[in-house]
Curated annotation (Swiss-Prot):
Carboxy-S-adenosyl-L-methionine binds at K69, W83, K88, G107, D129, P130, S131, V156, E157, Y176, R291. CDD domains: AdoMet_MTases. Belongs to the class I-like SAM-binding methyltransferase superfamily. CmoB family. Its EC number is 2.5.1.-. It comes from the Bacteria. The gene is cmoB. It catalyses: carboxy-S-adenosyl-L-methionine + 5-hydroxyuridine(34) in tRNA = 5-carboxymethoxyuridine(34) in tRNA + S-adenosyl-L-homocysteine + H(+). Homotetramer. Keywords: Transferase, tRNA processing. GO terms for biological process: tRNA wobble uridine modification. Catalyzes carboxymethyl transfer from carboxy-S-adenosyl-L-methionine (Cx-SAM) to 5-hydroxyuridine (ho5U) to form 5-carboxymethoxyuridine (cmo5U) at position 34 in tRNAs. GO terms for molecular function: methyltransferase activity; transferase activity, transferring alkyl or aryl (other than methyl) groups. NCBIfam families: PRK15068.1 (NF011650), tRNA 5-methoxyuridine(34)/uridine 5-oxyacetic acid(34) synthase CmoB (TIGR00452). This is tRNA U34 carboxymethyltransferase.
Length: 298
């Protein structure tokens, strides 16, 4: 696979039409002196931000809707994202040892988790996500944060051909979007250095047995959900991909304290995806979303 060809296609998409307009508007903000705090809310603070510049920043942030992962605060502009992503990150944080490591975040969205990882002193962080929209969101936030995080508009399928390998890979909320989950796990494994580890999460079916739900059309109104496994099935997938040391870190029911509609997204959110008369079921009648967080090694 020619990943440079894939890069060029995404670069061309980034540099055309509205995407190019937004990219240039971000660059036109200029070099603004600020301080950044990478806590539950990514907080960007300014000493003397003019009202005119603040209005530019607000307009740009609005043009980048919908905002899924976060939240972010830029001066007094609070980007109240659909997901309270700190809930997931704080579940994982006690298990992280990233000091001096080369880290990848596969399906990194706008970079929220990568910004949080900076507090753990990794050697290098590289994000992978083919979405030009979220790449622009990252560019917007990183314009102020000025980090050395690298953002590749590539997918998990490009990992076996990437120029370098990683000590730790995060792959959060991706595997159920792949029609061949075992192949995806093998792609993750191919990108690891010896002794490497993967932090993985997925929606799961809270039952015993080695099977997976394969929704006919949608799951929680999401069309590209292929398999929602039991934990036993997930462990089997990982073992087939030649991972070892399958460790369950946490499980959690997804609720409206974590995922909800805000003015910073368009369309619907979790409250619209569940049965209005029984929130233990999705609108389609499947078990409502629960997530399991695991660590696997090679």
């Amino acid at each position: 696979m020619d990943i440079n060809k894939a890069r060029k296609a995404k670069f061309d998409e980034l540099n055309s039409g509205k995407n190019l307009e937004i990219s240039r508007a971000i660059e036109a903000l200029g070099d603004l002196e600020c301080a950044c705090e990478f806590s539950d809310t990514i907080n960007i603070k300014f000493q003397n931000l003019s009202a005119e510049k603040k209005e530019e920043i607000y307009a740009l942030a609005k043009s980048l809707k919908p905002w899924r992962k976060g939240p972010f605060k830029i001066d007094d502009i609070f980007i109240d994202t659909e997901w309270q992503s700190f809930i997931k990150f704080n579940l994982l944080a006690p298990h992280l040892n990233l000091d001096g490591k080369s880290v990848a975040d596969v399906g990194c969205n706008n970079g929220y988790y990568m910004f949080r990882m900076l507090n753990f002193a990794p050697k290098k962080i590289t994000g992978f996500d083919p979405s030009v929209h979220t790449a622009l969101q990252f560019k917007f936030i990183n314009h102020f944060a000025k980090t050395n995080i690298a953002y590749e508009m590539l997918g998990v399928e490009h990992l076996p051909f990437f120029e370098s390998k990683f000590d730790t890979i995060f792959c959060l909320g991706v595997i159920y979007h792949r029609s061949d989950p075992i192949k995806m796990l093998k792609e993750l494994k191919s990108a690891l250095n010896p002794g490497g580890e993967v932090f993985l999460d997925t929606m799961y079916i809270d039952m015993r047995g080695e099977f997976a739900l394969s929704p006919k059309n949608t799951y929680s109104k999401i069309p590209n959900i292929y398999f929602v496994p039991t934990i036993d099935a997930l462990q089997g997938w990982c073992e087939r991909a030649k991972f070892k040391d399958f460790e369950i870190l946490a499980t959690k029911q997804t609720d409206t304290s974590e995922q909800r509609k805000t003015p910073w997204i368009d369309g619907q959110s979790l409250q619209n995806f569940l049965d209005p008369n029984d929130n233990t079921k999705t609108i389609e009648g499947y078990p409502a979303p629960k997530r399991v967080y695991v660590k696997i090694k090679i």
